[in-house]
Amino acid sequence: MAEAATGFLEQLKSCIVWSWTYLWTVWFFIVLFLVYILRVPLKINDNLSTVSMFLNTLTPKFYVALTGTSSLISGLILIFEWWYFRKYGTSFIEQVSVSHLRPLLGGVDNNSSNNSNSSNGDSDSNRQSVSECKVWRNPLNLFRGAEYNRYTWVTGREPLTYYDMNLSAQDHQTFFTCDSDHLRPADAIMQKAWRERNPQARISAAHEALEINEIRSRVEVPLIASSTIWEIKLLPKCATAYILLAEEEATTIAEAEKLFKQALKAGDGCYRRSQQLQHHGSQYEAQHRRDTNVLVYIKRRLAMCARRLGRTREAVKMMRDLMKEFPLLSMFNIHENLLEALLELQAYADVQAVLAKYDDISLPKSATICYTAALLKARAVSDKFSPEAASRRGLSTAEMNAVEAIHRAVEFNPHVPKYLLEMKSLILPPEHILKRGDSEAIAYAFFHLAHWKRVEGALNLLHCTWEGTFRMIPYPLEKGHLFYPYPICTETADRELLPSFHEVSVYPKKELPFFILFTAGLCSFTAMLALLTHQFPELMGVFAKAMIDIFCSAEFRDWNCKSIFMCVEDELEIPPAPQSQHFQN
């Protein structure tokens, strides 16, 4: 009984919605009927006579002023439309029409099943959009003191934005602090230091934390034991203070490496001690988690220092050991550091082995994964690839695999080829990246451009094939080929992550809507006619009369008919009629 009542209500609702869709026609005829019935009481004929008399008394200057005013208003609307489009990437009038007017005109499907399916689809797409627009820590980020600050000293430009540095501060507070830091004075100072905006204040706080730790070791340790080894075990150095000094105060990679080695000694002792106490309560477990993050961060940065200083094999060994020791800590994306170091060693077999593990459908992708896979496929055929030969004989199986790998990589991040082909200038990569965005493309190309140049013909193959990707995905924001549709939010996030002097790459290219172009042309043409009519009324009257005579002439109609007939004949390819034998010579 309840199901029957529910079905009846749904049918009644659909009938009401259908009637509202066409009810405006009924209202229109009702209004016409009422006007006809009430024409005598309302004195419609007299009012029309008064209006016609008023219009007849108007001078041409009034029409010119009216036209100019309408053109001015249209121009203001055009300027607002252009500003709204530049800022938000869509037309304001189109957005209002789609969002507000279409539901009022009955453009919304009220079927319950369709609504449930669409709501589920929308929620899935929203979740995908959130995951796609998540900001990630750049696994190949540079050192602030030894690299970013040196760039600022030379060029006077700030390579990092406030938003990017604020995200780094949040990461440091997440990785390097815990709830029990207030129990240790040095850690309490560092907890405040990570929140400081001023770099000099952070560095001073790190030195203060080390000094407090040193004073406590001198005062308290002799009361407990006289052994130097026991002193180090009791009161270790503050590892996070050394991390901050290595990141921001050290002006060279060698200095940063020395500080990280001191941080490693302190961090390793804290890690071993908290590992034994982690099962004694939630507080000790959180402290052990913090010490694990600190130790992994230090070892990863030491491996990156070795890579910067040319000790690539040592860096590879350190990264492999780190991945074996902490296989579950994927937040640092150490495998991307390993791939870059292996490419520097030209150990392509090892690169393929790493890709086989991480280039999986269930794991999140990155530009490093996709473009490294494309580089390995291109390496097999790029030295012999020729566009002319490929157009004559077609692509071989290996060449087809390489082209498909390039198309896959370009679909994931379409900004990378412009940097690899040096069509756009590179800048220092940010500390955070947006996957599939311009920031990720800069971070990848900054370190991997040399690897592509080292493979003979790889850039030539990329240059010949990368634009073919866009033919497979004509509407990338709506539907993808191998990946989800391209996220809309990348441009806004990249503008926050990248410095203002860099021109952010936008995909897909935004074109001005036809409405804006049509409005601009119409406003300009109307304003020009109004100005000419006001300045030269007699000449414009003669011109208008001449144009009317031309369009109404018989010659113009005959010419128009002939043009239409010729177009139809060309379209249908009508063969010419055969000549009669009586007219042949």
UniProtKB/Swiss-Prot annotation:
* Residues bearing the modification Phosphoserine: S386
Q: Which residues form the signal peptide?
A: none
Name the GO cellular-component terms.
membrane
**Listed InterPro entries:** ST7
User: Main localisation, per the record?
Assistant: membrane
Q: Which UniProt keywords apply?
A: Glycoprotein, Membrane, Phosphoprotein, Transmembrane, Transmembrane helix
Question: Could you tell me the membrane topology recorded for this protein?
Answer: Multi-pass membrane protein
Top-rank taxon of the source lineage equals Eukaryota
Q: Which family does it belong to?
A: Belongs to the ST7 family.
Q: What protein am I looking at?
A: Suppressor of tumorigenicity 7 protein
What organism is listed for this UniProt entry? Answer: Nomascus leucogenys (Northern white-cheeked gibbon)
Lineage of producing organism: Eukaryota, Metazoa, Chordata, Craniata, Vertebrata
Q: Which gene encodes it?
A: ST7
